[in-house]
């Protein structure tokens, strides 16, 4: 069973799907998992139709939101990818969940996929209502942004674009992926960009709201941000990090090792799914099964 819901953010609403377990009883209290989508994705893709549904089938209530400024969520201008807003979305989700009579507010966990893995970890440090965090191919978006191109040159370009927009120029909306798989292959794209195109630009994973667009003039925060800052002091909740064993250009593989090494959590684990890549873990049955075989016991033990 699924219900479309909205809850308040700062000055706009966040849209989400609320997934219920079989034989749901509204008089009981349930543990909840907030399942959050990759950068450029939406709630109808892997966070919802793969992992979210599996968690609901396993007995959890699951909240699958669209990020602020994206998908069916509110916020203007559209396509802002700003870590400060993305991280705060988790607190707004907790604010909503604690108002629901069937939610056990002491048993809230989060899952973050790809860039939302970094967001989930950062949010868990400050949001103590989150009791356990897991990531699937989690990436530190700030590091990714700094490694793709010259960060100083990009910050200068952002400053120029903001000035132009303040004076009336059109907004610059960047497309994060190739339009087709053939275009990605022709450009010799790295494995992550090629496989992202295969997922987002074909019937395999394509959804109307999974547009992979960003508003260029609002990218400066990401360039100066570190998802794992203060993890040695503040990340104390149970942590499960799952990565594919085939490293790719987005760096989730090495980020996984880094955050498990740095986290203050006494209960923490890195699980490498050998012979599978970043995007295989989005929806391929075998690696997804391996991931769920770790995730579901992790949440049942720690929530």
Where are the predicted features?
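N-terminal cap/lid segment of alpha/beta-hydrolase-fold proteins
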Residues: 1-28
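Short beta-strand/loop motif that positions the catalytic acidic residue
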Residues: 234, 241-243
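Conserved alpha/beta-hydrolase "acid-adjacent" motif
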Residues: 248-256
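Alpha/beta-hydrolase-fold enzymes
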Residues: 121-202
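The serine-hydrolase catalytic nucleophile loop
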Residues: 40-53, 67
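Catalytic histidine-centered segment of alpha/beta-hydrolase-like enzymes
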Residues: 276-288
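Alpha/beta-hydrolase active-site loop
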Residues: 80-101
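Conserved alpha/beta-hydrolase
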Residues: 54-74
């Amino acid at each position: 069973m699924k219900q479309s819901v909205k809850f308040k953010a700062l000055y706009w609403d966040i849209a989400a799907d609320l997934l219920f377990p079989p034989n749901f009883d509204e008089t009981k209290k349930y543990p909840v998992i907030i399942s959050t989508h990759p950068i450029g994705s939406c709630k109808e893709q892997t966070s919802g139709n793969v992992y979210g549904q599996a968690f609901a089938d396993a007995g959890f209530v699951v909240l699958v939101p669209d990020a602020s400024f994206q998908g069916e969520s509110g916020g203007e201008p559209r396509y802002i990818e700003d870590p400060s807003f993305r991280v705060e979305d988790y607190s707004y989700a907790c604010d909503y969940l604690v108002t629901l009579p069937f939610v056990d507010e002491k048993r809230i966990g989060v899952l973050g996929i790809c860039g939302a893995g970094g967001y989930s970890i950062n949010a868990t440090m400050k949001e103590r209502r989150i009791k356990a965090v897991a990531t699937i191919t989690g990436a530190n978006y700030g590091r990714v942004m700094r490694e793709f191109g010259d960060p100083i040159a990009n910050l200068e370009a952002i400053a120029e674009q903001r000035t132009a927009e303040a004076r009336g120029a059109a907004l610059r909306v960047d497309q994060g992926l190739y339009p087709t798989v053939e275009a990605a292959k022709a450009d010799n794209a790295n494995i992550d960009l090629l496989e992202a195109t295969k997922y987002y630009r074909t019937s395999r994973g394509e959804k109307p709201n999974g547009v992979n667009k960003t508003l260029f003039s609002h990218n400066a925060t990401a360039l100066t941000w570190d998802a794992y800052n203060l993890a040695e002091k503040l990340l104390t909740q149970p942590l499960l990090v799952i990565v594919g064993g085939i490293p790719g250009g987005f760096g989730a593989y090495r980020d996984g090792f880094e955050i498990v090494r740095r986290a203050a959590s006494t209960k923490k684990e890195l699980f490498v799914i050998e012979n599978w890549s970043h995007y295989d873990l989005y929806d391929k049955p075998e690696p997804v099964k391996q991931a769920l075989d770790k995730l579901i016991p992790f949440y049942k033990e720690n929530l």
